[in-house]
């Protein structure tokens, strides 16, 4: 009997040992050495880019890589310019989805929510505003026809309040600049984005900062990321969050500051169907709605640029580049996203940074990820 019991015990232990062979091995981590080499070399050879940093986020594993070179550290706080656009739209979508507390439809005319008599087409929606299809003259007019765009300069200045600026933009025409009917043409950036912020404050019943904290920062656990208006003062930025100005009139399309860790949480939200940690900030449908292509001629959703697919493939890459060189992106096929921070605050060569990431760094990261898939 004892011998039989020992035999049964031996068979049981062998079975337990064999069953462990069925467990899959731990997933190998990608090797991002070549990605780091690229970023380190870039900041060493580009005189207007003395530093750079990046963070890579996996949909399920979270942060899988972080690095910094030159005069940046992994904790640097940077001004993001247009890499603010996706976060801004994320808040607008959160308001749109809060049916229990907020009367707001992002696809309804903004005249439903604004108390002023406007000069622009009454059919304009907030969706039009943040897809750059409102018909209101866009951002590039400030560079090519600055005198004609001057009546709308409040969006770039730290003085005043967001609602005061929104009223000015909504009630002041730009007669010497071309405009179109809403949802008929793509005209990037500018007044339409600041006007969307005014809509948010009116429907949300609080300042942009209060709404940002309530709907995004607190549920996502953000520590640093917030909006201000340093666009006219960016060349003096020293990385101190206390130097953020224009808190009462934050710039919607380009006023955000952040560190890597906070921005990574926003990327994770868009990878995980609107979930930030244990909190559902947006619905899966809301996240997908931001990626819907509204301007196929250029590839743009709401905040996201949509990268053309490779021949025979489908769209998988969405990005949000900024004037100072930073760029964020998500890859819905590989289930990862990332952001690279640059600080080219002269504004003369930001595209060198974001363009280099798009054409050179992203393929390197894709290769590293594909090697362990």
How should each PLM-predicted stretch be described?
Residues 36, 40, 93-96, 111, ...:
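Non-transmembrane alpha-helical segments in soluble domains
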Residues 83, 95-142, 191, 198, ...:
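Active-site helix/loop module of the DD-peptidase/beta-lactamase fold
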Residues 48-50, 70-129, 177-191, 251-254, ...:
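Short active-site loop at a secondary-structure junction
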